Amino acid sequence: MANPLLYSPINPQFFQPLLPGFTNHLDIPVAFFLKYLVGTNVGKTAELRSDASEMTWKVKIDGRRLSNGWEDFTIAHDLRVGDIVVFRQEGELVFHVTALGPSCCEIQYGEDTLEEDKIEKLCGTENVSSKKKSLKREAESAPDNSLDSCFVATVTGSNLKRDTLYIPKEFALSNGLMNKYQIVLMNEEGESWKIDLRREAYNYGRFYMRRGWRSFCIANGKKPGDVFAFKLVKNEETPMIQLFPMTIEDLDKLQSLPRHKIRKTEAAPSSPDLSSFVATVTASNLSRDRLYLPKTFIMSNGLLKKFQMCLMNEEGESWTIDVKHEAHTGRFLTIRGWRRFCVANGKKPGDLLKFKLVHNEETPVLQLLPLNSEDLHKLNPSNDTRHGQSLKVTKKEFLGMEATENEFLGEEVYCNDSFKASEKDTLPFAEPINEDIRQGQCSQTIKQEYVSTEEKNSTSQNRFVTLTLTHSSKLNLPFEFMKRNGIKKAGKITMVDRYDAKWRTSLLMDKIGTMSLGRGSKGFCEVNGVEMNESFILELIWEDTVPLLKFCSKV
């Protein structure tokens, strides 16, 4: 059931994702501060409350920043990087705080935690603060005997060959190994090996040891199939984990022990997942080699000043693409790389793709995830762009305004060829023709003055032409082919890709009469899977007096 506290129509609220270093302070969003707090918080203290405890935390406000006392609140609520905190104002400087996990599910706290808070409340706020800080230091310097301080490892042929061992993410996080770069492995006799510790920038940030795992196994006679456990015995600048033997009975006991978790993240979702979005592949965004990103996704994840992103498929392969923010429209889009990603992964117009932000550092990583029925229900039918056609697009979700598809994309619709030649020459790239616009809005037949209607009914063998993509990306059309099909003048021509999406481009002619396809032909080849120096076959098809070059196959 959704938490009604997150949907209060009366009390103003704001949310903030927790980034590295969040325990030192938290900044209040500018818009919220200017509207509700400016002028009322100078040198004052805010009161924070939550459903997890009956306590009230007093936190100093320095300008827009929550400072002294904030760390105590984060420790008491076991807040971590990636969590989201929602503040609801209940008084001038009184806030109710709800903590959400990375999946935007409300964090649930165990009963023992609440009882401890009740006891600590009787001791006074200052004692609680010092007690929690001392407990934190003890946990870092002397690991306890709980299951969180150990893990089971299996030697395999693969991890020996790769000299890499993946360690449980829960073990690494619960013991504060996120910022550690080396770890010491110690055997039962006390001999030690220093090994590198790393965290992947993808695959949900898995932790692994490398450059030394193989040496450790060989020195201790460990072979594929052996199972043993490591226990964290020292957690300082360089953590130390010690090997201890595992019998079948020990393994069964270890696996059957219930894990004591302070918090649960499997509660029913109480807020939309701000770390993911669903995109639609269209003929338009393929030809333009760009994808517009939801503004809510960009803003909520702090990506406003990012200039590159990494798109990763389900197999872990990645593509780096550029990101651009249009200051005059407020739109966010990817440029140079979107088409390459789609082609490499066999994505075609009409496909729906779900991306999730799995790594948010210098270069954010968006991973492709499988769609489920819940994701499909989130799509607004009026924004459906499947089958390569933009049925209706608004930028209301980005800018709070309505616009037609072409206004949103900054395009103009021409219903005939009466526009000026200078305007035609400025078209930046080949662009798929929206079938609805061509049939429903453009009632007049496009006139092709360069076509000889007497000669357009050529024989079937004259309809096919083979071209080769070269480094110059210039696709010249053979003179005999053009002559036999009655195309004698430069102008506009339409290309049809393997997905039946139509691309409008220019038909150019040089001084000696050689005709070639204009800008956009390289993108057309990329969508059709044609690589450099590969040849492919096009078929000439006529629609009334309009010639179309349809992609047939690669040679």
Swiss-Prot record:
Taxonomic source organism: Arabidopsis thaliana
According to the UniProt record, one GO cellular component term is: nucleus
MF annotations from Gene Ontology: DNA binding
Name used for this protein in its record:
B3 domain-containing protein REM10
Superkingdom field: Eukaryota
Keyword field: DNA-binding, Nucleus, Repeat, Transcription, Transcription regulation
DNA-binding region, residue intervals: 11-103, 150-247, 276-372, 460-554
Report whether Transcription shows up as a keyword of the record.
yes
| Main localization category | nucleus
Q: Which residues cross the membrane?
A: none
Does DNA-binding show up as a keyword for this record? yes
Among PANTHER family, the record links this protein to: B3 DOMAIN-CONTAINING PROTEIN REM-LIKE 3-RELATED, TF-B3 DOMAIN-CONTAINING PROTEIN
Cellular location of this protein?
Nucleus
Write down a Pfam family by its short name.
B3
